[in-house]
């Protein structure tokens, strides 16, 4: 069955766009025509943050940019203002049994997002599957604009959910469409602050999703795809649909322009599917997922579930060299970037690294206002044997155990600043701090005197006002820690006060979701088995 599905998925797209199988980074992810850049490629020397003689904080600009501000400027934010900025995008959601068809292995999730780009190019998503089992969590990191990340965040979960449906459920879906009756609900979305959808193209997206489930019906699989197959094929099929949509004649100008933006921008993606004790993670690009594990002796460790797809990954370099002629070995990766322009080696969209030159030219000559649409009109040097980029994910399976306490998914804006071990340590500290607070209040009746005492203890121990959200704590430390891993209030304030055109030079968009597991529920699976 797998070979049949593989043949179908690879041959369901046009030959012209066939998808192939299979230290710290520069923050600028995509380098377009360098003569058109507002700033040129910058060095790996980090920007400097120095204490000012007057006791404030001075940020010295390290790169050329378009601001007309003075080169040095004084920055101050109160602790209350810092908290307001950091917590604006946070959300916490407890998973109820009614949101899953089986006993939950997930207790709750906490999420937050801090923008560096304007508008922010990251997206995130959480949804439960209503016709099958499972919860899905996703992080989507856009580049060259937010359009592709927005589209993938809206659509990918639907492709996965449809892939997992039984033949009978798919027949019910198709029958409803043919008779113009309401469709079965597919997903229940758990929303975040700032979530939005592209309403103008919803019908187009549904049409392509329908074609996908019609082809699944033609395979006559009673139980649907396995989760691993569903993740693998959903990533590739959605990327193919994104590419096909701009090639099809579209009369509506809004739809046409939006499809162009989605196809020519790009997005990396990392998503997790949790069904009882079964955890699958699919990753394409340089977002990342890790597990926080507590052993029986109380010691904590980090278990990586993904590998970054970039020039620092030797397996990715080998894959790229296998897929292209030996004559291109020295040009596939230049300046630690794919063809010298893109850091991640796997991504949705970015058709300028997938299509032939002829296809790109024919699409862009249809009268689009590409300058107004922020479309890159150039072909990288040494562009001989496309496609160079793929959206095929690496899929990891992990059988959850009682010692697996939490999962962290985040865009590379977090991992550029903190190591895997730092992230686990900070989440563990967050949990310990919350337990300390609860224990003190539980042991003694709460009153104003007790609360004042706790606040004084916190101040004496050097703790800032406790973040109720672990994702917020991670973002706080990502941008506020100095080179020794210590939080500096002045540095944090400076990083949050950067002008829009300068912020991107010092940090990336950061999006984080922390998923907490129910150890008792997970343990019950093993006892029951």
Swiss-Prot record:
Do the record's keywords include Flavoprotein? no
GO biological process assignments: signal transduction; T-helper cell differentiation
GO molecular function terms listed in the Swiss-Prot or TrEMBL record: [pyruvate dehydrogenase (acetyl-transferring)]-phosphatase activity; metal ion binding
Per the record, the domain of life is: Eukaryota
Q: Where does Mn(2+) 2 bind?
A: 141, 412, 508
For Mn(2+) 1, which residues are the binding ones?
Answer: 141-142
The Enzyme Commission number assigned here is 3.1.3.43
Q: Matching CDD domains, A to Z?
A: PP2Cc (cd00143)
Gene Ontology CC, one term:
mitochondrion
According to the entry, every stretch annotated as the PPM-type phosphatase domain falls at 106-517
User: Primary place of residence?
Assistant: mitochondrion
Q: Which UniProt keywords apply?
A: Hydrolase, Magnesium, Manganese, Metal-binding, Mitochondrion, Protein phosphatase, Transit peptide
Query: What are the boundaries of the transit peptide?
Result: 1-66
Q: Does the keyword Magnesium apply?
A: yes
PROSITE patterns associated with the record: PPM_1, PPM_2
Q: Which cofactor does it need?
A: Mg(2+)
User: What catalytic activity does the UniProt entry give for this protein?
Assistant: O-phospho-L-seryl-[pyruvate dehydrogenase E1 alpha subunit] + H2O = L-seryl-[pyruvate dehydrogenase E1 alpha subunit] + phosphate
Q: How is the cofactor bound?
A: Binds 2 magnesium ions per subunit.
Query: Where in or outside the cell?
Result: Mitochondrion
Q: What does this protein do?
A: Mitochondrial enzyme that catalyzes the dephosphorylation and concomitant reactivation of the alpha subunit of the E1 component of the pyruvate dehydrogenase complex (PDC), thereby stimulating the conversion of pyruvate into acetyl-CoA. Acts as a crucial regulator of T cell metabolism and function, with a particular focus on T-helper Th17.
The record's similarity note reads:
Belongs to the PP2C family.
**Classification via PANTHER family:** [PYRUVATE DEHYDROGENASE [ACETYL-TRANSFERRING]]-PHOSPHATASE 2, MITOCHONDRIAL, PROTEIN PHOSPHATASE 2C
Q: What's the protein name? A: [Pyruvate dehydrogenase [acetyl-transferring]]-phosphatase 2, mitochondrial
Q: Which gene encodes it?
A: PDP2
């Amino acid at each position: 069955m797998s070979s049949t599905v593989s043949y179908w998925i690879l041959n369901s797209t046009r030959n012209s766009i066939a998808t192939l199988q299979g230290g710290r980074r520069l923050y600028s992810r995509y380098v377009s025509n360098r003569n058109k850049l507002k700033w040129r490629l910058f060095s790996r020397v980090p920007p400097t943050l120095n204490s000012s003689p007057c006791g404030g904080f001075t940020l010295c600009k390290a790169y050329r940019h378009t601001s007309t501000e003075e080169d040095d400027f004084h920055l101050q934010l109160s602790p209350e203002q810092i908290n307001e900025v950091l917590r604006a995008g946070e959300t916490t959601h407890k998973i109820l049994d009614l949101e899953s068809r089986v006993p939950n292995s997930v207790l709750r999730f906490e999420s937050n997002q801090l923008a560096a780009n304007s508008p922010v190019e990251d997206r995130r998503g959480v949804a439960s599957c209503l016709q099958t089992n499972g919860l899905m969590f996703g992080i989507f990191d856009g580049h060259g604009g937010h359009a592709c990340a927005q589209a993938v965040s809206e659509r990918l979960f639907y492709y996965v959910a449809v892939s997992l449906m039984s033949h009978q459920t798919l027949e019910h879906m198709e029958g409803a469409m043919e008779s113009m009756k309401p469709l079965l609900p597919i997903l229940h979305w758990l929303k975040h602050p700032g979530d939005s959808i592209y309403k103008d193209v919803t019908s187009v997206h549904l049409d392509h999703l329908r074609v996908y489930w019609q082809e699944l019906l033609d395979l006559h699989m009673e139980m649907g795809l396995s989760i691993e197959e569903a993740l693998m094929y959903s990533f590739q099929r959605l990327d193919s649909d994104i590419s096909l949509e701009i090639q099809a004649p579209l009369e509506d100008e809004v739809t046409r322009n939006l499809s162009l933006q989605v196809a020519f921008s790009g997005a990396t993606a990392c998503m997790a599917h949790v069904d009882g004790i079964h955890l699958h993670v699919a990753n394409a690009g340089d977002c990342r997922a890790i597990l926080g594990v507590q052993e029986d002796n109380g010691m904590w460790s980090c278990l990586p579930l993904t590998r970054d797809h970039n020039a620092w990954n030797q397996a990715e370099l080998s894959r790229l060299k296998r897929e292209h002629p030996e004559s291109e070995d020295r040009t596939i990766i230049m300046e630690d970037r794919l063809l010298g322009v893109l850091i991640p080696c796997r991504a949705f969209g970015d058709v300028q690294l997938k299509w032939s030159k002829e296809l790109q030219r024919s699409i862009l000559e249809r009268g689009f206002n590409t300058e107004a649409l922020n479309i890159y009109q150039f072909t990288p040097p040494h562009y001989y044997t496309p496609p160079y980029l793929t959206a095929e994910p690496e899929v990891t399976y992990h059988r959850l155990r009682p010692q697996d306490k939490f999962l962290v998914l985040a865009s590379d804006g977090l991992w550029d600043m903190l190591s895997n071990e730092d992230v686990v340590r900070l989440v563990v500290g967050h949990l310990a701090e919350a337990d300390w607070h609860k224990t003190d209040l539980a042991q003694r009746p709460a009153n104003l005197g007790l609360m004042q005492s706790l606040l004084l203890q916190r101040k004496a121990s050097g703790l800032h006002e406790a973040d109720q959200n672990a994702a917020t704590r991670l973002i706080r430390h990502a941008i506020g820690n100095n080179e020794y891993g210590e939080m500096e209030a002045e540095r944090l304030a400076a990083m949050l006060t950067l002008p829009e055109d300068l912020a991107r030079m010092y940090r990336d968009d950061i999006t984080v979701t922390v998923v907490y597991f129910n150890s008792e529920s997970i343990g019950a699976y093993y006892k029951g088995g």
